[in-house]
Amino acid sequence: MQSLSTPHTISLLLPRTSPSRLSPSLHSLAFPTRLRSLSYSSQTSILPDAGDDFIVGDCLVYEDGVFEDPYLDKEVTQVAKQERKKNRRGGAKRLDESEIEPENLVPEEWRDIQAEVNLTKKDKRKIAQEMEFGVRVEKKRQGLIPLRKVDLNDFLTYKEAKLAQLRPVILDKPGNFSDDSGASSDGETAVSSPSERVAPKNPRWAVYGKGFDHVAKFFNSDKYDPSDKKSDGPRKLLSKEEKFMLNSRNPDLAVATSKKWLPLHTLAACGEFYLVDSLLKHNLDINATDVGGLTVLHRAIIGKKQAITNYLLRESANPFVLDDEGATLMHYAVQTASAPTIKLLLLYNADINAQDRDGWTPLHVAVQARRSDIVKLLLIKGADIEVKNKDGLTPLGLCLYLGREIRTYEVMKLLKEFPLSRHKKRLVTTDEDIE
């Protein structure tokens, strides 16, 4: 049997595990280089040589300081000390440090393409502005370039050639063309030779395509003579009624109108503020109604012309006028959802709870339109939610017939919550008065 104190038996007894890097016991583990064995019965010895390394499991364990070189350590420590001293003094450059200059690896032939690719949008915009400015400067420097000399004879020959190619038919005094039945015996129709341009049949076409300014300029010019009675004169452009109104210098605007649209109504609906002002200076009836029973205020409110509505009310237009169905101006303002017009009519003491012939109030109209903003405005201004129409429906009851939509629920919420909040405010004010 072998002795238990031999290295071979020790390696067999120890477990074969890989050493951990974190375990400090491997660094402190040291084995003697020479071991004395116990006495054997035989003279053989299994001890290894003194210079061999001992195997513990699968690892080789070396002595401390085997791979250390004292001369190399001294040089490294000296260099590190020198670097620390230089860094402390002023941050000098490290040893053996050389600056590397930037080098462009793009060939010279591609440098222009590289510069174009690297341009930003801002640079491109500046270049375009500079180019445009440079073109303008060059044009100003050049000045007016004289046209090339054109020969008049060449132009006339070119014109005649083009006219011969197009073959235009120009008739100023055409004769009476005969029909196919009135052809000559030879089968050829007689065509008069063109001589001059045809005069226009309708003299009104002379001012066709021109505006009011051109017509006014024509009447104010010297060419217009009111005393001229020639058939070919400028007055032929006007009808007899227009000539009479023009000669009277005080036109009757009530005559120059259609049955449905009065001039004042038309201009108010179009938003022509200055023309409305000029017409009212001719003593027109500002409360005149058309065929449908609408006044100028109705037309201005329907067209949402706030400036004209305010102007007409200042010019003493009737804010309490009714149409044929008994609707007030407040009904029309609510129907058009014009909050400024509603506030303006309330300043002129318009009735916010007025009913038409069917018993509808402005609040009914706002609920039917499902405009929560107009409903809220009317409730704030004091609209009554308990007024019923001829069908016995209040504004809240009317909501039940409008379907299940989000806008309908918003209107119902306003109608149910707003009276409660107003009732609470009244209770608070009464409690304060009692105290």
Swiss-Prot record:
Keywords, comma-separated and alphabetical: ANK repeat, Chloroplast, Plastid, Repeat, Transit peptide
ANK repeats: 259-288, 292-321, 325-354, 358-387, 391-424
Reported consequences of knocking out the gene: Plants show a developmental arrest of the embryos at the globular stage.
Extent of Polar residues compositional bias: 178-195
Protein localization: Plastid, Chloroplast
One GO CC term, this protein: chloroplast
Induction: By light.
Tissue specificity remark: Expressed mainly in chloroplast-containing tissues. Also detected in roots, stems, flower buds, developing siliques and dry seeds.
Molecular-function GO term, any one: molecular condensate scaffold activity
Annotated Low complexity bias: 11-22
Organelle transit peptide residues: 1-36
SMART domains: ANK
Assembly notes: Interacts with EMB506. No homodimerization observed.
PANTHER family: ANKYRIN REPEAT FAMILY PROTEIN (PTHR24203), PROTEASOME 26S SUBUNIT, NON-ATPASE 10 (PTHR24203:SF86)
Protein name in UniProt: Ankyrin repeat domain-containing protein, chloroplastic
Organism: Arabidopsis thaliana (Mouse-ear cress)
